[in-house]
C-alpha cells in the first residue's frame, strides 16, 4: 500500500491537487514536503497532532518532511477559519513561542533520533520573512497576486462582511513565499495542512509557477489537506470542559491527556485510532470488533489513550497516568506520590489547613465539603466521607499528620465522585 492509499484508508485526505499526478510523483521520487505551524501559544495542542503525524507517515514512507515554524507569519496571524482578527503578540513573545514549538516538534517527530537522509528538517520562516523589505515584498511577491484572485479565497471572502485588515489580507502572500522559498532551497514540492489551508496552499503553488515561469524547468508542485476533526456528539474536538488539551505536560498533565483519549465516544474511537496512531489495519480491525461486541470494556479507548500518551509524552508518563487512573478506580489513593496527587486532583476544590490536628466535622464545613455541621454529621454517619480512599464513620475523627500524603495533601471524597484536595500548610 503506497502512502496516499494508506492515508485514504485512514480517512486522512480531504483534498489534493491533481491526485493522479501526485500519486505518480510520490511513487517515482523521494519527495520533500512541508507543513507549517504558527506560534500562537507556548505549546502545540492536540489539533496539531494530525499534521505532525502526517509528517511522520511521509517520513516512514521514505520521503523528506520539513516542519516549518512560523516565526515570521506568527507575527501577523492567519485569518483562515476565524471570524475576527487575532490580537498581535509582541515580537519577543512570538520568538519565545517559536522556540518552544521547535523543541516540541523535535521531540514529537524524532528529529534528533538519527542522521538518515530523510530525517525531519526544522525551519523557521522568520529567517527569510524577517529580513524582507516592503519593496521586495511588493515587487517580488505582490505583483503575482491579483486582488480578485485573493478575494475569491475562502479565508478572505469569509471575512469581507465583518472586515479584514491589510495585515491579515497579506497573510496568504507570506505563506506563499514560504512554499516558494522551500521549493527553491529544498526542492520542496508538496505542502500539507488542515482543510482551512487550501486557499493558502494553492496560492503558494501559483506563486511558484508565476515567479519561475520564464525559467526552463518542469514545475511540479502539489497540495494536500487533512479533514477537520469532528466529534459524533457535535462538541468541538480538542477541548474538555472548555479547556484546550495541550501537548506540554505543564499545561495538560499526562493523566489529563490520557483521560481525554480514554473518554472518547464509542462512535469516534476507531476513527481517531486511524487518524492519530500508527496501528496496522489488522490491529484496528480487531479493536473495531471489540467496540461492536464489548463496548463496556473500552478496549479501543484504552489502546488509543496508551498510544497517544506514549507518543506525546513517554512510557514513564503513560505508566504514571495509568497508575493514577487505577488508584481513582479502586479508591486506593495512598499508593500515589505527591506529583501524582497533584495531577489527579488539579481541578478539584481545595482548602488549606495548618499542621495541627483538625476535627473531621469542622474540616468538612470549613472546606465547604458539607453545607453545615448537621449535614457533616449525617455524611459521616451515612458512610459518605472518605479520607485518602478509606471510609471514615467516626464523628470524633481528627485529620492529622498520618493522613497527610507526602506530608502535603489529604484527599477527601464525598459520595462516589466528589473529590476535595486538602493542602497542608508548608513549613516556613
Curated annotation (Swiss-Prot):
<dbReference type="InterPro" id="IPR036986">
    <property type="entry name" value="S4_RNA-bd_sf"/>
</dbReference>
<keyword id="KW-0694">RNA-binding</keyword>
<dbReference type="GO" id="GO:0003723">
    <property type="term" value="F:RNA binding"/>
</dbReference>
<dbReference type="GO" id="GO:0004831">
    <property type="term" value="F:tyrosine-tRNA ligase activity"/>
</dbReference>
<keyword id="KW-0648">Protein biosynthesis</keyword>
<protein>
    <recommendedName>
        <fullName>Tyrosine--tRNA ligase</fullName>
        <ecNumber>6.1.1.1</ecNumber>
    </recommendedName>
</protein>
<dbReference type="InterPro" id="IPR001412">
    <property type="entry name" value="aa-tRNA-synth_I_CS"/>
</dbReference>
<feature type="short sequence motif" description="'KMSKS' region">
    <location>
        <begin position="236"/>
        <end position="240"/>
    </location>
</feature>
<dbReference type="GO" id="GO:0005829">
    <property type="term" value="C:cytosol"/>
</dbReference>
<dbReference type="InterPro" id="IPR024088">
    <property type="entry name" value="Tyr-tRNA-ligase_bac-type"/>
</dbReference>
<comment type="subunit">
    <text>Homodimer.</text>
</comment>
<dbReference type="InterPro" id="IPR002307">
    <property type="entry name" value="Tyr-tRNA-ligase"/>
</dbReference>
<keyword id="KW-0547">Nucleotide-binding</keyword>
<feature type="binding site">
    <location>
        <position position="175"/>
    </location>
    <ligand>
        <name>L-tyrosine</name>
    </ligand>
</feature>
<dbReference type="Pfam" id="PF22421">
    <property type="entry name" value="SYY_C-terminal"/>
</dbReference>
<keyword id="KW-0436">Ligase</keyword>
<dbReference type="GO" id="GO:0005524">
    <property type="term" value="F:ATP binding"/>
</dbReference>
<dbReference type="InterPro" id="IPR054608">
    <property type="entry name" value="SYY-like_C"/>
</dbReference>
<keyword id="KW-0963">Cytoplasm</keyword>
<comment type="similarity">
    <text>Belongs to the class-I aminoacyl-tRNA synthetase family. TyrS type 1 subfamily.</text>
</comment>
<dbReference type="Pfam" id="PF00579">
    <property type="entry name" value="tRNA-synt_1b"/>
</dbReference>
<comment type="function">
    <text>Catalyzes the attachment of tyrosine to tRNA(Tyr) in a two-step reaction: tyrosine is first activated by ATP to form Tyr-AMP and then transferred to the acceptor end of tRNA(Tyr).</text>
</comment>
<dbReference type="InterPro" id="IPR002942">
    <property type="entry name" value="S4_RNA-bd"/>
</dbReference>
<keyword id="KW-0030">Aminoacyl-tRNA synthetase</keyword>
<dbReference type="GO" id="GO:0006437">
    <property type="term" value="P:tyrosyl-tRNA aminoacylation"/>
</dbReference>
<feature type="binding site">
    <location>
        <position position="171"/>
    </location>
    <ligand>
        <name>L-tyrosine</name>
    </ligand>
</feature>
<keyword id="KW-0067">ATP-binding</keyword>
<feature type="binding site">
    <location>
        <position position="239"/>
    </location>
    <ligand>
        <name>ATP</name>
    </ligand>
</feature>
<dbReference type="InterPro" id="IPR024107">
    <property type="entry name" value="Tyr-tRNA-ligase_bac_1"/>
</dbReference>
<feature type="binding site">
    <location>
        <position position="34"/>
    </location>
    <ligand>
        <name>L-tyrosine</name>
    </ligand>
</feature>
<dbReference type="InterPro" id="IPR002305">
    <property type="entry name" value="aa-tRNA-synth_Ic"/>
</dbReference>
<dbReference type="InterPro" id="IPR014729">
    <property type="entry name" value="Rossmann-like_a/b/a_fold"/>
</dbReference>
<feature type="short sequence motif" description="'HIGH' region">
    <location>
        <begin position="39"/>
        <end position="48"/>
    </location>
</feature>
<feature type="domain" description="S4 RNA-binding">
    <location>
        <begin position="358"/>
        <end position="424"/>
    </location>
</feature>
Amino acid at each position: 500500500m503506497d502512502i496516499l492509499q494508506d492515508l485514504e484508508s485512514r480517512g486522512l485526505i480531504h483534498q489534493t491537487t491533481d491526485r493522479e499526478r501526485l500519486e505518480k510523483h510520490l511513487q517515482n521520487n523521494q519527495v520533500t514536503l512541508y507543513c507549517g505551524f504558527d506560534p500562537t501559544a507556548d505549546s502545540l495542542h492536540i489539533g496539531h497532532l494530525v499534521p505532525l503525524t502526517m509528517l511522520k507517515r511521509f517520513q516512514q514512507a521514505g520521503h523528506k518532511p520539513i516542519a516549518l515554524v512560523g516565526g515570521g507569519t506568527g507575527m501577523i496571524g492567519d485569518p483562515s477559519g476565524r471570524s475576527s482578527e487575532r490580537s498581535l503578540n509582541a515580537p519577543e513573545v512570538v520568538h519565545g513561542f517559536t522556540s518552544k514549538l521547535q523543541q516540541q516538534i523535535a521531540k514529537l517527530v524524532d528529529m534528533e533520533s538519527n542522521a538518515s537522509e530523510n530525517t525531519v528538517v526544522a525551519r523557521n520562516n522568520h529567517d527569510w520573512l524577517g529580513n524582507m523589505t516592503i519593496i521586495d515584498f511588493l515587487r517580488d511577491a505582490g505583483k503575482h497576486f491579483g486582488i480578485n484572485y485573493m478575494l475569491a479565497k475562502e479565508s478572505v471572502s469569509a471575512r469581507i462582511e465583518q472586515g479584514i485588515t491589510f495585515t491579515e489580507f497579506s497573510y496568504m502572500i507570506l505563506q506563499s513565499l514560504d512554499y516558494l522559498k522551500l521549493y527553491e532551497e529544498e526542492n520542496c514540492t508538496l505542502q500539507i495542512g488542515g482543510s482551512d489551508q487550501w486557499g493558502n496552499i494553492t496560492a503558494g503553488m501559483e506563486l511558484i509557477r508565476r515567479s519561475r515561469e520564464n525559467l526552463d524547468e518542469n514545475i511540479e508542485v502539489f497540495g494536500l489537506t487533512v479533514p477537520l476533526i469532528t466529534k459524533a456528539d457535535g462538541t468541538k474536538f480538542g477541548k474538555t470542559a472548555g479547556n484546550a488539551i495541550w501537548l506540554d505536560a505543564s499545561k495538560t498533565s499526562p493523566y489529563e491527556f490520557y483521560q481525554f483519549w480514554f473518554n472518547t465516544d464509542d462512535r469516534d474511537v476507531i476513527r481517531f485510532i486511524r487518524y492519530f496512531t500508527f496501528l496496522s489495519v489488522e490491529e484496528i480491525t480487531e479493536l473495531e470488533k471489540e467496540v461492536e461486541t464489548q463496548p463496556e470494556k473500552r478496549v479501543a479507548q484504552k489502546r488509543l489513550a496508551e498510544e497517544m500518551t506514549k507518543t506525546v509524552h513517554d512510557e514513564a508518563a503513560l505508566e504514571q497516568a495509568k497508575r493514577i487512573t487505577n488508584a481513582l478506580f479502586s479508591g486506593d489513593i495512598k499508593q500515589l506520590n505527591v506529583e501524582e496527587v497533584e495531577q489527579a486532583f488539579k481541578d478539584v476544590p481545595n482548602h488549606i489547613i495548618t499542621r495541627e490536628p483538625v476535627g473531621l466535622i469542622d474540616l468538612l464545613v470549613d472546606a465547604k465539603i458539607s453545607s453545615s455541621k448537621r449535614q457533616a454529621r449525617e455524611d459521616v454517619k451515612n458512610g459518605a466521607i472518605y479520607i485518602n480512599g478509606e471510609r471514615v464513620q467516626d464523628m470524633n475523627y481528627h485529620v492529622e499528620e498520618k493522613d497527610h500524603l507526602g506530608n502535603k495533601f489529604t484527599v477527601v471524597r464525598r459520595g462516589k465522585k466528589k473529590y476535595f484536595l486538602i493542602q497542608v500548610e508548608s513549613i516556613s
